[in-house]
Amino acid sequence: NNIHNRQVSAFTDEVLNFACFNTQSFRDYFRNCCMKIAQNTEVDGFFWDEPHYAYPKSYASITGGAGDDWSCRCPVCKKKFEEYYGYEMPRIMNDDVKQFRWREAMVILRETSKALKEYNPALEITCCVHATLNTYYVTELRGYDNWDLVASCPYFDVFSTTIISWDLPEKFFADVTERTVRMAKKYNKQSERWIMGYNKSPKDLAQVDKAVDLYESMGVDRLATWTYRGGYGTVVQAENPLALWDRIGENYRRVRGKQEEAQEKRS
C-alpha cells in the first residue's frame, strides 16, 4: 500500500526504492507494526538500527564521498518544508534543509517510542546512529547526524553509535567513544558501543582486547557485537570468523567478571 510515498532524489526527481518516513502513511504503518509486536510477544525492547535517509547514489566511501545528491524531496517533504519556511524546498541543500531533515526524521521514532512506552514503560528503547566525526566517516548528512536531537529524546533509554572498521586509527575509536559517552550522560541515557564482528577481522586479535579496554576505560555502559559467530557461513563472514567470535566472547567474560567482582566488593 501507499507505494507512491517513497523518497525522491533532490537532483533528478528519481523515485527511490525507499519509503519516506516523513509521510503520515508510513509513520502510521511503522508505529502499528511495532505496537503489534509489543502487544503480541514478550519482547523486552526495540532497537532502532542506523536510521537514515536514502542515498540516491548507491554507495558511500570511507571519506564521505557519496556525492552531493540527497533525499528526500518528495511532494510531502516539499509541502511540509514550504509551509514551515515559506519558500520552495531547494534542490541544493542549505541550513534550512538540514534542520528540516533532522527535525522530521525524529518524528517517526519519537512518536513510535512514545506509544510503546505508554503501552509498556518497561520496554527498553535503543537508538543507534552512525559513528560520524565531522565529514571523515560517511557523515553525508544522513538525517540523524545531530546527536543532541537523538540523545535528548525522552523515550530513548540507550544512546548507541555504530561499528567502526578495524582499519581505522585508534584515535578515531577514542574520539567517537568519548562523544558517545558524553552525549549519553548529558541526557541521562546509557551509552553503547559496537564491536565489528563481520567482514574484516583485525590484523591482530589483540585489537579486540584493546577496543574493549578502551570502551571500558572511557565509561561505556554497554557493549554489543554484530554479527553472530563472526558471520560464519554467510557472505559477510570475517576472516577466521570463529576465532574472532571466540575472542569477543572472551572479552565479554572478562568484563562481566570484573563487574561481578566489583559488585561483590560493594556488597
PLM features: what roles do these ranges have?
Residues N1-E14, W48-E88, V138:
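Aromatic- and acidic-residue-enriched segments that line the glycan-binding/catalytic groove
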Residues N1-T41, F81-D95, R110, A206-V208:
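Active-site-adjacent "subsite" loops/lids of carbohydrate-active enzymes
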Residues F30, I37, F46, L116, ...:
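Conserved, mostly hydrophobic/aromatic
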Residues D44, D49, E82-I92, R142-F172, ...:
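Aromatic- and acid-rich polysaccharide-binding/catalytic face
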Residues F47-P51, D96-G143, N188-K200:
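Aromatic-lined carbohydrate-recognition surfaces of secreted/lumenal glycan-active proteins
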Residues S160-P169, E192-Q263:
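Substrate-binding cleft of secreted/luminal carbohydrate-active enzymes
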